[in-house]
Swiss-Prot record:
One of its GO terms (cellular component) is plasma membrane-derived thylakoid membrane. NDH-1 shuttles electrons from an unknown electron donor, via FMN and iron-sulfur (Fe-S) centers, to quinones in the respiratory and/or the photosynthetic chain. The immediate electron acceptor for the enzyme in this species is believed to be plastoquinone. Couples the redox reaction to proton translocation, and thus conserves the redox energy in a proton gradient. Cyanobacterial NDH-1 also plays a role in inorganic carbon-concentration. It is found in: Cellular thylakoid membrane. Gene3D superfamilies: Cytochrome-c3 Hydrogenase, chain B. It is a peripheral membrane protein. PROSITE patterns: COMPLEX1_49K (PS00535). This is NAD(P)H-quinone oxidoreductase subunit H. One of its GO terms (biological process) is photosynthesis, light reaction. It catalyses: a plastoquinone + NADH + (n+1) H(+)(in) = a plastoquinol + NAD(+) + n H(+)(out); a plastoquinone + NADPH + (n+1) H(+)(in) = a plastoquinol + NADP(+) + n H(+)(out). One of its GO terms (molecular function) is NAD binding. NDH-1 can be composed of about 15 different subunits; different subcomplexes with different compositions have been identified which probably have different functions. The keyword Translocase applies.
């Protein structure tokens, strides 16, 4: 080994793959000069399960339950993207009501994702108390999912080509609005505890700073990109689903450090609440119980039996064939841009199914921003990126 400026030999330390701060089975081979990080080599692949090859040997309907095992904090986002790709390739329309239901589920998942990021991140930097608070709110989201889909964290299997698996249960939208009313003050509570806490701010301000051009050149996305001064959100850029119907703002900051990434995610939860409240009020047909009452009262000629009031355009047969052609479709998850490149050959299984995971791209900048940092800051910087290794390794 070559000698360093301190006239000592560099020390190589392994973090993980079995370490509570690794957020999964991630291994970091870190070279240290005393307390300073000289080099860092992430070692991934411990959780590789061949998801793309599984997708290429399953029909579009069969693969939906698999995807929530990739990023188990963002199962709804992956369900959405794997049905969006065949929909676009086959030109299948989605009813307005189904699109609203999808948006509600996606925004609930965004909040759950950020909460699952917030608790462990704060625990990494020494704030243990909020770690227990976030599980209280996440349980309420899981209760809503359980009522609508039958499952809680993963294996919701709710999204379908052309819509969703079933309409919302009676009283569900009211419960969702109750959650919004409950959760808004809780965000204020988090901020009161954390945001201007001088110990917390001194711990993470200025850490892992990424400039605007760096973020673009490293192909970052999501809060990692928006915290570096780039207000890029695919919900605004690509106009998918019905996000254009709602009044909301893109959360972004300029500093590019761990603290900026924290503030972006806090603000995103507030914006998700705005979208949820509007979606619950504006959903075509209103609550399911009201919609069914209107249909029964007015009969088959009721306008509420029209296309935009359905929860699915047409139930796709198990023998649904993906048309010839190829496309790339993407959406904004809690971690950033997730996408699917789909190549069909007029068969029930895709010829090629390539998955783009946001956290894999975001993780690649880690060695770059760790150089020169202190060994105690490794966990704070890694935690601010928000990685789930099931999604990174696939």
């Amino acid at each position: 080994m070559s000698q360093l400026e301190t006239r000592t030999e560099p020390m190589v330390v392994n973090f993980g793959p079995h370490h509570p701060s690794m957020h999964g089975v991630l291994r970091l081979v870190v070279t240290l000069d005393g307390e300073d990080v000289v080099d860092c080599e992430p070692v991934i692949g411990y959780l590789h399960r061949g998801m793309e090859k599984i997708a290429e040997n399953r029909t579009s309907v069969m693969f939906v339950p698999y995807v929530s095992r990739m990023d188990y904090a963002a199962g709804m986002f992956y369900e959405a993207i794997v049905v969006n790709a065949p929909e676009r390739l086959a030109n299948i329309s989605v009813p307005k009501r189904a699109s609203y239901i999808r948006v509600v589920m996606l925004e609930l998942n965004r909040i759950a994702n950020h909460l699952l990021w917030l608790g462990p991140f704060l625990a990494d930097v020494g704030a243990q108390t909020p770690f227990f608070y976030i599980f209280r709110e996440r349980e309420m989201i899981y209760d809503l999912w359980e009522a609508a889909t039958g499952q809680r964290l993963i294996n919701n299997n709710y999204f379908r080509i052309g819509g969703v698996a079933c309409d919302l249960p009676w009283g569900w939208l009211e419960k969702c609005q109750d959650f919004c009313d409950w959760f808004g003050p809780k965000i204020d509570e988090y901020e009161k505890l954390i945001t201007n806490n001088p110990i917390f701010r001194r711990r993470i301000e200025g850490l892992g700073a990424i400039g605007r051009d760096e973020a673009i050149n490293w192909s970052l996305s999501g809060p990692m990109l928006r915290a570096s001064g780039v207000p890029w959100d695919l919900r605004k850029v690509d106009h998918y689903e019905c996000y254009d119907d709602f009044d909301w703002d893109v959360a972004w900051e300029k500093e590019g450090d761990c603290y900026a990434r924290y503030r972006v995610r806090i603000e995103e939860m507030r914006q998700s609440l705005k979208i949820l409240r509007q979606a619950c009020e504006m959903i075509p047909g209103g609550p399911t119980e009201n919609l069914e009452a209107q249909r029964m009262a007015e009969g088959k000629k009721s306008p509420f039996t029209g296309f935009d009031y359905q929860y699915v355009s047409k139930k796709v047969a198990p023998t649904f064939k993906i048309p010839n052609g190829e496309l790339y479709t993407r959406l904004e998850s809690g971690k950033g841009e997730i996408g699917v490149f789909l190549q069909g050959n007029n068969d029930v299984t895709p010829w090629r199914f390539k998955i783009r995971a946001a956290d894999l791209n975001n993780l690649q900048i880690l060695p770059h921003i760790l150089k020169g940092a202190k060994v105690a800051d490794i966990m704070a910087i890694l935690g601010s990126i928000d990685v789930i290794m099931g999604s990174v390794d696939r």
